[in-house]
Design a protein with these regions (language model features):
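Short acidic/polar inter-strand loop motif in beta-rich domains
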Residues: 387-393, 415-424, 656-660
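Short coil/turn motif common to extracellular beta-sandwich-like domains
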Residues: 43-47, 326-329, 604-612
Length: 664
């Protein structure tokens, strides 16, 4: 079957077109071309999300093609595939498609004040005790970590980063996922000092959620931190989430997970494979861990078209010019499985220089090289796309092509009745809007999607220069990704402070990843001779998301059984500003309290089997076996009281005015 109809100017030399089975998506084909042009070794691997047929034999596939499968949810699996066997693997009858996906990209001072976190840290008079994240894990999936920054040390100078998986690392212990390295002791973490990346994004994000430094303290300064330094692939994100969920289960501790990275384009209704797999993993875990995902920073771009068609005909007609790097990714999706036709044309003053078409229901993908007839290294790749349910109702386009003066791309979509979406990754569509610009990664049903509002419109940098913007404090950060989702849900779920946020900077970052003009504070390290630490300002939903993650850690400290449905009630209607104090008041009001006004409120933590007292006046906490044997007695406990293992335990909480009995 011919997947594309091609036309080009009579004066041009024929360009090269290569047809592939539709099992290889546009992004996968593009990745293959990029590695081939860079003369990369065929022994290298490609990370992808694979759709498997029903009852596929994973053991056979692994043995035949050298593929390592990691996370499997339904018919979707993350996999590490040798480049040399990629095509043969994709053509196997047990494989429906292989999608390398697009590269994920990055999406506290006043932040604490605006989100009312300081009231939780302070305890009295606002609350009967302080909430700082103690006993709670914060998992961060990101890149560019400085493990040695004082933002991540406790009062004794010990690192609060207790476990690291660097997916791109090469020297060290390999985790169960089969790639990268693990640092799981204080000595290994200290020796590594940082992940492979030369970025600073992860350091900034993690410190917003959990910094314990006196200057620019984070939301949950006494939480323990677990890091996955991602390789920036969609499959790597899924593997990271599964890894963190497994770690929390082994440690028997509640965890709040932060993802300030993602992919922009896709179905944007929760049926993109990455969004669906995130939902599936959280659901399988019993929703014991909470997760916040950045809504993205595309709210300033007219990059999306959403339209309804009532009958057969042209439903989208638009044009676009890629940014200066001449790259663009386009996604077109439909609410139904009715086939639609996509035509992409390169036009200029002298007519059509190149044209290609693809139908959403075909069984082939196609790539075109050197589309001008000259060796310009251009590459245009098109493929049909399936959603997480296996319904083929999308088309993906990846392109790179240098344009001549006056040239632009035209995109036409013809189809039957239904709702359609077209969105681009980097630039704008000429008749697009900024509605539904939030990241496809953040459109799942379960995680909390986070947008950003402005909490600071200016700051003074290290040079003494005031850096300011024309943003309005309290209003939506202009770049914050907007809803609704393609299926009509209001998104994002909540807004949090995201501009300008001052937080820790990675000492090991490459100079091109740190804008010196944005550095706002520095101090000499108290423990490491010769080291100077830095803090700087950054903006975006990447910064807003760890505010929410850290606040959820505080709420988990108060109630370790907190779930996503309850969190949504605490944060209010979609688009509300996060308010940690009001949320905690609502949370504590719903905690099971002893009926007598003479007793104090408590919380039982099932993860650690401990009683947490959240009121004053406790004289003693006693734990008994059912035969009356005293197993434990704590006078005036400050720390949580652990309940020994057993079929049933009786706990008596005695105060100066009475006592309360409970069974565990």
């Amino acid at each position: 079957m011919v997947a594309a109809a091609l036309a080009f100017m009579a004066s041009a030399q024929p360009f090269q077109s290569v047809y592939y089975p539709s099992k290889l998506t546009a992004s996968t084909i593009t990745r293959v071309h990029q590695r081939a042009s860079a003369l990369r070794s065929a022994d290298e691997n490609i990370h992808a999300i694979v759709r498997l047929c029903d009852e596929a034999d994973l053991d056979r596939l692994a043995a035949d093609y050298g593929v390592a499968f990691n996370v499997v949810t339904g018919n979707l699996a993350t996999a590490v595939i040798p480049m040399r066997s990629l095509v043969a693997f994709a053509e196997d009858a047990d494989v429906e498609n292989v999608d390398a996906g697009n590269t994920v990209r990055a999406m506290t001072d006043l932040a604490r004040e605006y989100s009312q976190v300081d009231a939780l840290h302070g305890g009295l008079p606002d609350f009967p005790r302080s909430f700082t994240g103690k006993g709670v894990l914060i998992g961060v999936i990101d890149t560019g970590f400085d493990f040695m920054h004082p933002a991540f040390r406790d009062a004794e100078g010990n690192s609060r980063i207790i476990h690291v998986w660097d997916q791109s690392g090469r020297n060290g212990n390999t985790p169960s996922m089969g790639y990268g390295v693990v640092f799981d002791t204080p000595e290994l973490i200290r020796s590594a000092a940082h992940d492979v990346s030369r970025d600073t994004h992860g350091t900034h994000v993690a410190a917003i959620a959990a910094s314990s430094a006196d200057v620019y303290k984070g939301m949950a300064p006494e939480s323990d931190i677990v890091i996955v330094a991602t390789d920036k692939s969609e499959s790597g994100i899924i593997d990271a989430l599964a890894y963190l969920l497994d770690y929390a289960e082994k440690e028997k501790k509640p965890m709040a997970i932060n993802l300030s990275m993602g992919t922009v384009i896709g179905f944007k209704d929760g049926t993109d494979p990455i969004a669906s797999m995130i939902d599936e993993l959280l659901d399988k875990s019993g929703k014991k861990c909470l997760m916040a995902i950045a809504a993205g920073n595309e709210g300033h771009r007219n990059s999306t078209i959403v339209t309804e068609a009532t009958g057969q005909g042209e439903v989208i007609n638009t044009s676009f010019t890629p940014p200066s790097h001449m790259r663009e990714n386009i996604f077109i999706g439909c609410s139904t499985t009715s086939a639609f036709q996509v035509t992409l044309s390169l036009v200029g003053s002298d007519g059509v220089a190149f044209e290609t078409s693809i139908s959403s229901d075909v069984s082939e993908s196609v790539s075109h090289e050197n589309i001008t007839g000259e060796k310009d290294y251009s590459l245009v790749t098109l493929s049909p796309m399936k959603d997480a349910d296996g319904l083929q109702r999308g088309v993906s386009i990846n392109l790179y092509a240098p344009l001549k003066d006056g040239q632009k791309w035209k995109l036409s979509v013809t189809g039957a009745a239904g709702k359609y979406i077209a969105c681009c990754d980097y630039g704008e569509l000429d008749n697009g809007s900024n509605a539904s610009t939030m990241a496809a990664t953040a459109c799942g049903q379960i995680p909390i999607s986070v947008g950003a509002y402005v909490s600071r419109d200016k700051f003074t940098n290290l040079q003494g220069t005031e850096r300011s913007s024309d943003w309005t404090v309290g209003e939506r950060y202009p770049l914050s990704g907007m809803g609704p989702a393609f299926d009509g849900r209001d998104k994002p779920d909540v807004l949090a402070p995201g501009a300008h946020i001052i937080s820790a900077i990675n000492n090991y970052a490459a100079s091109y990843n740190v804008n010196r003009e944005d550095l706002a504070y520095t101090e000499v390290d108290a423990l490491i001779p010769g080291r100077t630490n830095y803090w700087g300002a950054m903006c975006g939903t990447s910064m807003a998301t760890p505010v929410v993650t850290g606040i959820m850690a505080l709420w988990l400290q108060a109630n370790p059984r907190l779930d996503f449905d309850h969190v949504r009630k605490l944060i209010g209607s979609p688009g509300s500003h996060i308010d940690a104090k009001t949320g905690m008041e609502s949370l504590l009001a719903g905690v099971e309290l002893p009926k007598s006004k003479n007793t104090v409120p408590y919380i039982y933590n099932p993860f650690t089997r401990s009683i947490v007292i959240i009121g004053e006046g406790v004289v003693c906490v006693e734990v008994f076996a059912v035969d009356g044997t005293v197993l434990k007695r704590k006078n005036r406990p400050v720390e949580p009281v652990h309940i020994p293992e057993g079929a049933m335990r009786i706990v008596r909480i005695t105060t100066s005015t009475g006592s309360h009995i409970l069974k565990i």
